[in-house]
A protein has these predicted regions:
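Class I SAM-dependent methyltransferase SAM/SAH-binding core
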Residues: 46-102
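Core SAM-dependent methyltransferase catalytic element
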Residues: 180, 186-202
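A short glycine-rich, Lys/Arg-flanked "PGG" loop and its adjoining helix->strand segment in the class I
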Residues: 126-138
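Conserved beta-strand signature within the Rossmann-like core of class I S-adenosyl-L-methionine
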Residues: 139-146
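A short acidic, Gly/Pro-enriched loop at the edge of an enzyme's catalytic core
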Residues: 101-112
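A short SAM/SAH-binding and catalytic strip from SAM-dependent methyltransferases
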Residues: 112-124
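Short alpha-helix
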Residues: 162-177
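Conserved alpha-helix/loop element of class I SAM-dependent methyltransferases that forms part
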Residues: 24-43, 58
Length: 202
């Protein structure tokens, strides 16, 4: 396995190093994006591709009486996320091994679903977005957060199995999954957060 595969599926010692690095390097974009959601005291959140677990930890602080769950394809990531959030495991925090296209949670149980720096590596993006739509409650929010949105970025050739999506592409996938009120938010550094709502069917 090429070492860049650890971007999508951290394993072994190198994977542990990657997870520690991600917790640090993803902090600016994570804090910026989390401010875009109106957190309640009892918000139920799911972070897909939870990596090192720092965003779950932040969500638990933002919603002191809510829950924060995580899913990751990497067993190393699941272990790290559990370690970082061990204080609330089994009570307010639930972390499972799984993928975005087959989310191991029941339908309509989350107020917000986030995906930080991870959709580049999802095999079937449409199926994954359909799954996110399924687990969201009515009026729930999906937030896809990316630093990369230019298909010509050199990262596209440097990292194994990466696919970089434009805001327009992500918006279309979301629309096809049934999402509405799709908004593309960008900051001065070019970081992107594509937000969408699951509206109740009347």
């Amino acid at each position: 396995m090429g070492w860049t595969r650890n971007f999508s599926n951290p394993k072994g010692f190198i994977g542990k190093v990657f997870l520690a690095s991600m917790n640090a390097t993803h902090t600016p974009i994570s804090k910026w994006a989390l401010k875009k959601y109106d957190w309640k005291t009892d918000t139920a959140a799911l972070d897909i591709g939870c990596g090192g677990g720092m965003n779950i930890k932040r969500m638990l602080k933002l919603s002191p009486h809510g829950i924060a769950a995580g899913v990751d394809v990497s067993e190393e990531s699941v272990k790290k996320s559990m370690q970082v959030n061990r204080k609330h495991l089994g009570t307010r925090c639930f972390i499972k091994h799984g993928s975005a296209d087959n989310i191991p949670f029941e339908s309509e149980c989350f107020d917000v679903v986030t995906a930080f720096e991870t959709i580049y590596f999802w095999g079937d993006l449409q199926k994954s977005f359909n799954e996110i739509f399924r687990v969201l409650k009515n009026d729930g929010t999906f937030m896809a957060v990316c630093e990369l949105s230019d298909s010509k970025s050199p990262w596209g050739k440097m990292v194994e199995n990466i696919r970089i999506y434009t805001p327009e592409q992500l918006s279309q996938y979301m629309s096809d999954a049934g999402f509405t009120d799709i908004k593309v938010l960008k900051n001065k550094s070019g970081r992107m957060c594509v937000c969408a709502k699951k509206k109740a069917v009347i």
